[in-house]
């Protein structure tokens, strides 16, 4: 792969015009063979790997020839052979071909995405969930409306192939891709008869399709948004009681005047801001209601024009931050006016002004969380804890670990909110539900369970909580404001409760538009 990248850097035209001969390079299939064995070795016995999974390059080349045929004689996604040995060998060669196809397509895509990102000076972003929180603190208070959009995850295979043709000139190299996509579309497992680009299965091929599809959507959308918002306004800004992130420092510009030691700090404030996590992008807009309606209409037309997709109106929702709450990612978000005293000195302290700034206020969605806990049988609809009967067959350690994992996930995820009083109600529900589950298992009472376990209930998460507050209210942090937020860095993904709540909200919006 390093050799392919070096060739692409020297001559990108060669990469775009001569990709097809790479399919007949034996080194490519050796790489895909090793990668497939590394992935599957954890789930299959070693004796199967040594006896039946020997790679034959002659068989691979014959397999490539079968892919080019119109009758689709090779089955890549569904194995219908009743013989388990032949079924495993067919799956082995099919996965090798898919790995090789992905490797070939990744070479020009990685080079193109690298140079496209380097050329976008003002669209650089951190590719992590941790960058969402400083983005919300910086950009949302300077906006008055947001667009909550969802990326369409179903697309026709021919449209997907045509998007590849925009940056790959080697048409023969796309024939195997077209055959693979159509075969997946016509497979019995795919009932929608379309390509689902969301990677529901963790394979390299589907992950590549999703990354390419999102990159293609955003690259075209960013170029159009830049043209529409070419006039940028400069407003004075300050960051009181905020951590200096690298992203924030980059947005500061210093204008120096001749024969003067003074400097004016100004904040670049574009009118349109974009953030995405998963398949849910959010566009924050500062402008009149007409501008918001135009942006919403443009997003709907954009998908129809470039990807020939009919988007339902509920997939692009607009609302004002001052009147409604938004959700991203799994939070209720609102913007409130918070009077903060900021001293502004100008021209040798001749003028002092007090500025009023907007502040983002993440709210813990207590009522939806209680509703989801009731759905999962941790409590009733009113929030009264009940025993989790389906877990009574587990061991005591497994029950404690599962409850502890749920609480630790919720506490870490919502620790950046100002108002965390509702979290202690959730902790009470989970702790009492855990005690009732153990009491139901041992046919005892809650008092006996608490007396026997004592501090063992949520021991791991409570220790994390104590470390969190000891760090926050230490002697060094005592001088800081008690309303300073600390975002935990333990977040690796959105918690399942937030995903479930988001699905419920989507169904409500869909039913509202259907009426």
From Swiss-Prot:
A GO term from the CC aspect: chloroplast
GO molecular function, one term: RNA binding
InterPro entries: Domain_X, Maturase_MatK, Maturase_MatK_N
Lineage top rank: taxon: Eukaryota
Protein location: Plastid, Chloroplast
Keyword entries, A-Z: Chloroplast, mRNA processing, Plastid, RNA-binding, tRNA processing
GO biological process: mRNA processing; RNA splicing; tRNA processing
Known role: Usually encoded in the trnK tRNA gene intron. Probably assists in splicing its own and other chloroplast group II introns.
Stored HAMAP family: MatK
Family: Belongs to the intron maturase 2 family. MatK subfamily.
Protein name: Maturase K
Natural source organism: Pinus patula
Lineage of the species this protein comes from: Eukaryota, Viridiplantae, Streptophyta, Embryophyta, Tracheophyta
């Amino acid at each position: 792969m390093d050799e392919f990248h070096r060739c692409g850097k020297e001559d990108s035209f060669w990469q775009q015009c001569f990709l097809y001969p790479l399919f007949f390079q034996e080194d490519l299939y050796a790489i895909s063979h090793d990668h497939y064995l590394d992935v599957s070795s954890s789930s299959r016995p070693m004796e199967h790997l040594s006896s039946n999974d020997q790679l034959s390059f002659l068989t691979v080349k014959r397999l490539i020839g079968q892919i080019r045929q119109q009758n689709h004689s090779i089955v890549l996604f569904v194995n219908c052979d009743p013989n388990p040995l032949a079924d495993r060998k067919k799956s082995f060669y099919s996965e090798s071909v898919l790995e090789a196809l992905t490797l070939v397509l990744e070479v020009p895509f990685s080079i193109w995405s690298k140079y496209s990102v380097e050329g976008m000076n003002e669209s650089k972003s951190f590719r992590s969930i941790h960058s969402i929180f400083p983005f919300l603190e910086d950009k949302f208070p300077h906006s008055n409306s947001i667009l909550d959009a969802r990326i369409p995850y179903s697309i026709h295979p021919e449209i997907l192939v045509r998007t590849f043709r925009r940056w790959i000139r080697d048409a023969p190299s796309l024939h195997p891709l077209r055959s693979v996509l159509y075969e997946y579309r016509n497979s019995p497992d795919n009932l929608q008869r379309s390509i689902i680009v969301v990677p529901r299965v963790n394979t390299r091929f589907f992950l590549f399709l999703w990354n390419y599809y999102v990159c293609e959507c955003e690259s075209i959308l960013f170029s159009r948004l830049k043209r529409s918002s070419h006039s940028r306004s400069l407003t004075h800004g300050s960051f009181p009681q905020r951590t200096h992130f690298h992203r924030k420092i980059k947005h500061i510009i210093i204008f120096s005047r001749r024969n003067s030691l003074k400097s004016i700090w100004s904040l670049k404030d574009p009118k349109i801001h974009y953030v995405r996590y998963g398949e849910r992008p959010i566009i924050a807009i500062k402008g009149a209601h007409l501008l918001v309606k135009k942006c919403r209409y443009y997003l709907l037309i954009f998908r129809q024009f470039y990807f020939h997709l009919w988007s339902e109106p509920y997939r692009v929702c607009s609302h004002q931050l001052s009147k409604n709450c938004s959700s991203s990612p799994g939070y209720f978000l609102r913007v409130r006016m918070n009077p903060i005293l900021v001293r502004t000195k100008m021209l040798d302290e001749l003028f002092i002004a007090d500025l009023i700034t907007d502040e983002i206020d993440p709210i813990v969605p207590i009522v939806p969380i209680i509703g989801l806990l009731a759905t999962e049988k941790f409590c009733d609809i009113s929030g009264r804890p009940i025993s989790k009967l389906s877990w009574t067959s587990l061991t005591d350690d497994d029950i404690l670990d599962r409850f502890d994992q749920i609480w630790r996930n919720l506490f870490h995820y919502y620790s950046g909110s100002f108002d965390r009083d509702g979290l202690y109600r959730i902790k009470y529900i989970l702790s009492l539900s855990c005690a009732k589950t153990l009491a139901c298992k041992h046919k005892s009472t809650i008092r006996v369970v608490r007396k026997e376990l004592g501090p063992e209930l949520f021991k791991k998460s409570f220790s994390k909580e104590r470390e969190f507050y000891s760090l926050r209210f230490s002697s060094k942090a005592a001088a800081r404001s008690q309303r300073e937020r600390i975002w935990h860095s333990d977040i690796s993904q959105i918690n399942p409760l937030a995903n479930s709540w988001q699905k419920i909200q989507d169904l409500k919006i869909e039913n509202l538009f259907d009426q």
